């Protein structure tokens, strides 16, 4: 891929991007209390005395939250720090009842790691490694609600104290596409691990986007931080718009100010929120209510043993062991639910065919990607809501494989399956869709077509071999799509010489 550059009035500019991703930890309880974490609960119904910062209430670390952070670090090949510590980040805001946030500035639980991203879906060589500086665990704040009263804002503390992983990348990205690819890959890894559901629309994963511009080869410029961006598409838009804004500002003789900004998706622009604070503004110091975290080898081994097959390893296995194309392997592993669905389909298909999975993998993958995805997309549905299960898909593939129906008829059957929820065999029987291999009937249809198209027969015999497809199509049409394509091809070749 060509390098991304912003063409200004005075020449080319390079954009430098780093992301700080806040990922809500998948856990039934909060980081330092036993309060629930379910999304969508009534305001202030999931708040403990610790979350509300009542006097005398002391935090107790949730083992599961620590475990999920360690597993995430292992999934990105990061250094796991056996000794880490919590710090207080001091600031005042109405949604922060303690007056400080418990975070990890000086000694995070996870150190340096990296993620490899593919920048072009159709080019497996378009790889780039994005460095990750650290992952630290911290509390989320509450939520201000401004639409409940004409003159007052209300506070919902359900989110207060929920565990977050802040995943801080290095400034290694150089284009909106790279930022989007990195965020998508990170979300995929988190979903595979099960440490965050990655639902950006629900706020359980959001990104702070750091952007600066410079002349190629020069030192980094002054960066701005656009807070709480909640979709991959918006992150890419922020990078593009903020970089263009900075270039225009500099070329007009202005100076980029280190500040915090917000993104307005309706106007597709960023706007200033406040000046950007430095660490000393928050007066960090070790939290006196919490002992340092000390992780032993047994705990780390437990975390490592619980990791699933990760997307890069799964993709490699699909290509090498199952013989799938790099593109198909990429599509099937980009989402953990898709990978699970495919593997269930593959197991069912192999069992019905009494063949190894490697022999039926291409058929299963092609059908899932080309047929089922396309049909679901037309309906505005997804695999999660599909009435067609992996077992039902395998039943349909078995009917194609044994010659009961043709590929074209299978498309009709799939539409009926999605419409009714019925099985493929029942639909084929009810609708009379079985494929015929009756050579007499097929031969009669071919004879009629050749007689009606004598001119094309002459052209074919004169060397215009592309017309063979025309004869096949006409025969299938005459047989209402029910003729066995193999028999049609064989008989046509005999008759056309």
Swiss-Prot record:
InterPro entries xref list: Asn/Gln-tRNA_amidoTrfase_suB/E, Asn/Gln-tRNA_Trfase_suB/E_cat, Asn/Gln_amidotransferase, Asn/Gln_tRNA_amidoTrase-B-like, GatB, GatB_C_1, GatB_Yqey_C_2, Gln-tRNA_amidoTrfase_suB_CS
Protein family (similarity comment): Belongs to the GatB/GatE family. GatB subfamily.
Coiled-coil positions: none
PANTHER family cross-referenced by the UniProt entry: GLUTAMYL-TRNA GLN AMIDOTRANSFERASE SUBUNIT B MITOCHONDRIAL AND PROKARYOTIC PET112-RELATED, GLUTAMYL-TRNA(GLN) AMIDOTRANSFERASE SUBUNIT B, MITOCHONDRIAL
UniProt GO BP: glutaminyl-tRNAGln biosynthesis via transamidation; translation
Subunit structure: Heterotrimer of A, B and C subunits.
Statement: the UniProt record of this protein carries the keyword Protein biosynthesis: yes
EC numbers for this chain: 6.3.5.-
Function according to Swiss-Prot or TrEMBL: Allows the formation of correctly charged Asn-tRNA(Asn) or Gln-tRNA(Gln) through the transamidation of misacylated Asp-tRNA(Asn) or Glu-tRNA(Gln) in organisms which lack either or both of asparaginyl-tRNA or glutaminyl-tRNA synthetases. The reaction takes place in the presence of glutamine and ATP through an activated phospho-Asp-tRNA(Asn) or phospho-Glu-tRNA(Gln).
Record keywords, A-Z: ATP-binding, Ligase, Nucleotide-binding, Protein biosynthesis
SUPFAM superfamilies, A to Z: GatB/YqeY motif, Glutamine synthetase/guanido kinase
Pfam family, one: GatB_N
Listed name of the protein: Aspartyl/glutamyl-tRNA(Asn/Gln) amidotransferase subunit B
UniProt GO MF annotations: asparaginyl-tRNA synthase (glutamine-hydrolyzing) activity; ATP binding; glutaminyl-tRNA synthase (glutamine-hydrolyzing) activity
Catalytic reaction list: L-glutamyl-tRNA(Gln) + L-glutamine + ATP + H2O = L-glutaminyl-tRNA(Gln) + L-glutamate + ADP + phosphate + H(+); L-aspartyl-tRNA(Asn) + L-glutamine + ATP + H2O = L-asparaginyl-tRNA(Asn) + L-glutamate + ADP + phosphate + 2 H(+)
């Amino acid at each position: 891929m060509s390098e991304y550059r912003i063409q200004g009035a005075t020449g080319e500019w390079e954009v430098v991007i780093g992301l700080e991703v806040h990922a809500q930890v998948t856990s039934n309880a909060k980081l330092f209390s036993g309060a629930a974490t379910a999304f969508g609960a009534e305001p202030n119904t999931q708040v403990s005395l610790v979350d509300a910062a009542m006097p005398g209430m002391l935090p107790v670390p949730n083992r599961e939250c620590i475990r999920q952070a360690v597993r995430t670090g292992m999934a990105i090949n990061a250094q796991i720090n056996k000794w880490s510590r919590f710090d207080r980040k001091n600031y005042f805001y109405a949604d922060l009842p303690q007056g400080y946030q418990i975070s990890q500035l000086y000694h995070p639980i996870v150190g340096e790691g990296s993620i490899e991203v593919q920048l072009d879906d159709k080019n497996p060589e378009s790889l780039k490694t994005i460095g990750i500086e650290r992952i630290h665990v911290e509390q989320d704040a509450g939520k201000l609600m401004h639409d409940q009263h004409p003159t007052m804002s209300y506070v919902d503390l359900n989110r207060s104290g929920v565990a977050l992983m802040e995943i801080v990348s290095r400034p290694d990205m150089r284009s909106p596409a790279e930022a989007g690819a990195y965020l998508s890959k990170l979300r995929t890894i988190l979903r595979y691990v099960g440490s965050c559901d990655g639902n950006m629309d629900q706020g359980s994963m959001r990104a702070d986007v750091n952007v600066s511009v410079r002349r190629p080869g020069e030192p980094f410029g002054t960066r701005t931080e656009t807070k709480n961006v909640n979709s991959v598409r918006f992150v890419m838009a922020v990078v593009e718009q903020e970089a263009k804004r900075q270039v225009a500002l500099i070329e007009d003789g202005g100076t980029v100010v280190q500040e915090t900004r917000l993104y307005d998706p309706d106007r597709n622009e960023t706007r200033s929120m406040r000046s950007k604070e430095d660490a000393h503004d928050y007066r960090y110091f070790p939290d006196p209510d919490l002992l340092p975290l000390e992780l032993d080898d047994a705990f780390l081994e437990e975390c490592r043993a619980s990791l699933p097959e990760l997307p890069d390893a799964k993709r490699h296995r699909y290509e090498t062991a199952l013989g799938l194309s790099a593109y198909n392997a990429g599509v099937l592993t980009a989402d953990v639910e898709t990978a699970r669905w495919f593997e269930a389909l593959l197991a069912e298909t192999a069992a019905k065919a009494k063949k190894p999975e490697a022999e039926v993998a291409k058929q299963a993958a092609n059908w899932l990607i080309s047929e089922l995805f396309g049909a679901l997309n037309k309906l505005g549905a997804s695999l999660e809501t599909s009435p067609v299960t992996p077992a039902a898909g395998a039943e349909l593939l078995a009917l194609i494989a044994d010659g009961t129906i043709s590929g074209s008829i299978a498309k009709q059957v799939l539409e009926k399956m999605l419409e009714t929820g019925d099985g493929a065999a029942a639909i084929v029987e009810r609708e009379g869709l079985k494929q015929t291999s009756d050579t007499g009937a097929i031969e009669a249809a071919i004879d009629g077509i050749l007689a009606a198209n004598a001119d094309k027969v002459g052209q074919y015999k004169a060397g215009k071999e592309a017309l063979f497809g025309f004869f096949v199509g006409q025969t299938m049409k005459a047989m209402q799509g029910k003729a066995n394509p193999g028999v049609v091809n064989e008989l046509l070749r005999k008759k056309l010489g």
